[in-house]
């Protein structure tokens, strides 16, 4: 059983048959060893008690009721004076019934069975280690081919090499007909092999260090070769180099973790604890059971049949043995990952059985729903909405959520500042929502980060830290630039908020997890904070004004008709385009509804006049009575004096472009000010302007 205080991490990997046996075996006082499930039965139809050596056996998995054996005898749990700890009649241990949640059993397979996860999943570990095509290994596993060679390194009778197709069997007629079943099994293991046993023997003969050396030599040879110019051949060489790198990494992993490759072929099949695959009695004659129980039953039936064929029968045809081995392999495949090798296993109502992979993986699987999706203290959840006015490292936290998450902090400060005499009075003030409560809460939020997480957390940017800001409503406000890291959008997505309590967690949030410190992708280094969706739409609206030039606007009759159809509130659309001395006047005119975002206007240009090179010929020249004149170009206008000196320069733009320019300018100034302050000594700061 996993103790949360002593076990801080969980690792899923390969285990040896000895370890599986250790998990399951128990030695009774009479010396009998229990743990192996040999019968495909669950409960007796008359007594409703678990069958002995069945899938719910109390001797193997523990008592159904704490301290009560199958005979009905009772012992005090944990009392060392009580003797014996096992019932002498039924062999059930007097322990807590919760042992049935973690006590495992095992099935001793009559023939080695391939673990389908390591064969069919990508990348296939067995294909990588053996360096053979996947279809060839599948034909061996499912007994479509024989692997003919001296596996045991002894003289052979047939002198065959390579793969032999099952249907042809050219060796069949050379075998004397007086071979019995047991003799045939010995002969086959000596001369040739098929099924999971052939894969297991090849994996057992591997030397991982030799694999690393040979793969490294081949990779260096391919690296030294020059490109052939043939795209197909060059890609083939590149794929081979990638395969060799994966093979070396996998071999190093097996060496580093002390895992033997032959463990990927099962000799002992673990049986889950019964509480994890329950069976319920609805009525007297109706049962509801887990699909895993039905698959276990088929495995035991087929395994017992194969055992009988190999041990008891004398003249069983070898085709029948091969067929039964294939059925056993398919049953174990259905338990691990139903449907991965073709047609899934179904029940009598044509419903697909739910395998272990279906229980573990997916959004509703054991990991994501039960473990990662488990509710914890000091956490909340709500829908996210866009917060365009927020800083990149801030998020909007609803008052209702904030006061619940930080209630303990608010109570502490109320008592510390002598605003409440005890916890009860402080909670009363919080329930009444007094103004002092919100002031204290805002002080706490100014210096306490929170963690935002969006499931599924597939990479480290799926959970980031923010400084919260109190907002109205019930939705969490999020800056749109951080959505890409969360893979979130604002169409109803929900996010969870967590409060880091310890100083270590708060320090980690500030130093490593703040959103403005995770601007680049940790995998490829590309910017992860890029404008998407709403921001791109907003930028398009700001810059989609009529910028085609003065000629098109002035002399196109269709454009004049469009002007006449616009809103009457914008008086400049029917007359000439307005002139503004600075951006503030243009913004004021927009707020007074005198212009809109896309209305063309003339804005006085106050920057270096040398940036405008008068290389083009003016479209029009307007002369004033005082002697000044206007040179009108496509996108700008120059006002000159009588002496042809430049008095003013106006650029033709829109209010949307002005707003975008101001935002960019403020961002650059803020960045420059932050860089200067970071380089100056402590206590000296650069003020804006």
From Swiss-Prot:
Cofactor-binding details, from the entry: Binds 1 Mg(2+) ion per subunit.
Q: Does the keyword Acyltransferase apply?
A: no
Chemical reaction(s) catalysed:
RNA(n) + a ribonucleoside 5'-triphosphate = RNA(n+1) + diphosphate
Binding-site residues for Mg(2+), renumbered to this chain: 489, 491, 493
Q: Which cofactors does it use?
A: Mg(2+); Zn(2+)
Quote the function comment for this protein: DNA-dependent RNA polymerase catalyzes the transcription of DNA into RNA using the four ribonucleoside triphosphates as substrates.
Q: Which UniProt keywords apply?
A: Chloroplast, DNA-directed RNA polymerase, Magnesium, Metal-binding, Nucleotidyltransferase, Plastid, Transcription, Transferase, Zinc
Q: Which family does it belong to?
A: Belongs to the RNA polymerase beta' chain family. RpoC1 subfamily.
Pfam families reported in the protein's UniProt record? RNA_pol_Rpb1_1, RNA_pol_Rpb1_2
Q: Where is the signal peptide?
A: none
The places in or outside the cell where this protein is found are: Plastid, Chloroplast
In terms of SUPFAM superfamilies, this protein maps to: beta and beta-prime subunits of DNA dependent RNA-polymerase
Question: This protein is called what?
Answer: DNA-directed RNA polymerase subunit beta'
Grouped into one coarse class, the protein's main location is plastid
Gene name in the database record: rpoC1
A GO molecular-function descriptor? DNA binding
**Which InterPro entries does this one have?**
DNA-dir_RpoC_beta_prime (IPR045867), RNA_pol_asu (IPR000722), RNA_pol_N (IPR006592), RNA_pol_Rpb1_1 (IPR007080), RNA_pol_Rpb1_3_sf (IPR042102), RNA_pol_Rpb1_clamp_domain (IPR044893), RNApol_RpoC1 (IPR034678)
Its GO biological process annotations read:
DNA-templated transcription
A GO cellular component term found in this entry reads: chloroplast
Which EC number applies? 2.7.7.6
């Amino acid at each position: 059983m996993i103790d949360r205080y002593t076990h801080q991490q969980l690792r899923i990997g390969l285990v040896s048959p000895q370890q599986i046996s250790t998990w399951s075996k128990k030695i009774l006082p009479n010396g009998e060893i229990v743990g192996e499930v040999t019968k495909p039965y669950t409960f007796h139809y008359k007594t409703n008690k678990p069958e002995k050596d069945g899938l719910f056996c109390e001797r193997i998995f523990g008592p159904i009721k704490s301290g009560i054996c199958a005979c009905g005898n009772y012992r005090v749990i944990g009392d060392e004076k009580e003797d014996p700890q096992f019932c002498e009649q039924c062999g059930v241990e007097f322990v807590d019934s919760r042992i049935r949640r973690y006590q495992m059993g095992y099935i001793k397979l009559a023939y080695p069975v391939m673990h389908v996860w390591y064969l069919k999943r990508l990348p296939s570990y067995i294909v990588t280690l053996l360096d053979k095509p996947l279809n060839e290994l599948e034909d061996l596993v499912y007994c479509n081919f024989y692997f003919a060679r001296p596996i045991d390194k002894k003289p052979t009778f047939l002198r065959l090499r390579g793969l032999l197709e099952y249907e042809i069997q050219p060796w069949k007629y050379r075998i004397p007909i007086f071979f019995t079943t047991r003799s045939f099994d010995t002969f086959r293991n000596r001369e040739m092999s098929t099924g999971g046993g052939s894969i297991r023997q090849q994996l057992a003969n591997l030397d991982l260090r030799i694999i690393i050396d040979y793969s490294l030599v081949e990779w260096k040879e391919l690296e030294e070769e020059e490109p052939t110019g043939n795209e197909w051949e060059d890609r083939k060489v590149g794929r081979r180099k990638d395969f060799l790198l994966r093979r070396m990494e996998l071999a190093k992993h097996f060496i580093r973790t002390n895992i033997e490759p032959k463990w990927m072929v099962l000799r002992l099949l673990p049986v889950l604890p019964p509480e994890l695959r329950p069976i319920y009695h609805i009525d007297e004659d109706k049962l509801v059971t887990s699909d895993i129980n039905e698959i276990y039953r088929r495995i035991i039936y087929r395994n017992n049949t194969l055992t009988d064929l190999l041990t008891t029968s004398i003249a069983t045809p070898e085709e029948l043995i091969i067929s039964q081995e294939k059925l056993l392999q398919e049953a174990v495949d259905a338990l691990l990952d139903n449907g991965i090798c073709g047609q899934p296993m179904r029940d009598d109502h044509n419903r697909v059985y739910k395998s272990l992979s279906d229980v573990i993986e997916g959004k509703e699987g054991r990991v994501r729903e039960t473990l990662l999706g488990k509710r914890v203290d000091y956490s909340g959840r709500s829908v996210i909405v866009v917060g365009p006015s927020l800083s990149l490292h801030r998020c909007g936290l609803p008052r209702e959520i904030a006061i619940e998450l930080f209630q303990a902090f608010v109570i502490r400060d109320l008592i510390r500042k002598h605003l409440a005499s005890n916890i009860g009075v402080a909670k009363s003030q919080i329930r009444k929502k007094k103004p002092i409560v919100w002031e204290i809460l805002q002080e706490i939020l100014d210096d306490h980060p929170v963690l935002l997480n969006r499931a599924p957390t597939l990479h480290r940017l799926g959970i980031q830290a923010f400084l919260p800001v109190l907002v109205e409503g019930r939705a969490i406000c999020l800056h749109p630039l951080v959505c890409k890291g969360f893979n979130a959008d604002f169409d109803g997505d929900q996010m969870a908020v967590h409060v880091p309590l310890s100083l270590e967690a708060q320090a980690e949030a500030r130093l490593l997890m703040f959103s403005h410190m995770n601007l680049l992708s940790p995998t490829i280094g590309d910017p992860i904070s890029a404008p998407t969706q709403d921001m791109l739409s907003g930028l398009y609206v700001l810059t989609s004004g009529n910028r085609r030039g003065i000629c098109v606007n002035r002399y196109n009759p269709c454009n004049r008709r469009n002007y006449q159809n616009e809103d009457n509130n914008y008086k400049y659309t029917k007359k000439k385009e307005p002139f503004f001395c600075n951006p503030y006047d243009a913004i004021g005119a927009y707020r007074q509804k005198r212009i809109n975002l896309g209305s063309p206007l003339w804005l006085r240009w106050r920057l270096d006049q040398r940036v405008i090179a008068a290389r083009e010929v003016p479209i029009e020249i307007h002369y004033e009575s005082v002697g000044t004149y206007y040179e009108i170009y496509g996108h700008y206008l120059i006002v000159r004096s009588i002496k042809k000196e430049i008095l003013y320069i106006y650029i033709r733009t829109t209010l949307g472009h002005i707003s975008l320019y101001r935002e960019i300018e403020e961002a650059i100034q803020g960045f420059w000010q932050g860089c200067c302050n970071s380089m100056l000594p402590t206590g000296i700061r650069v003020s804006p302007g």
